[in-house]
From Swiss-Prot:
GO terms for cellular component: extracellular space. Its main location: secreted. InterPro entries: Cecropin, Cecropin_insect. This is Sarcotoxin-1B. One of its GO terms (biological process) is innate immune response. Belongs to the cecropin family. Keywords: Amidation, Antibiotic, Antimicrobial, Immunity, Innate immunity, Secreted, Signal. Disulfide bonds: none annotated. Sarcotoxins, which are potent bactericidal proteins, are produced in response to injury. They are cytotoxic to both Gram-positive and Gram-negative bacteria. The modification Arginine amide is found at residue 62.
């Protein structure tokens, strides 16, 4: 009976420490994904600006 209590206690302690180390790993991946999303957003905004300028040039050239 005591062995079961000790085993459960040790398992809980290991789960707590493993959960904390996992959070750091997941946080790093989350930040990388967020950074990729920000770069994609910025590139899209730049492409839209260039496309609008090209459309303005084409409209001006047509007269």
């Amino acid at each position: 009976m005591n062995f079961n209590k000790v085993f459960i206690f040790v398992a809980l302690i290991l789960a707590v420490f493993a959960g904390q180390s996992q959070a750091g790993w997941l946080k790093k991946i989350g930040k990388k994904i967020e950074r990729v999303g920000q770069h994609t957003r910025d590139a899209t905004i730049q492409v839209i600006g260039v496309a609008q300028q090209a459309a303005n040039v084409a409209a001006t050239a047509r007269g």
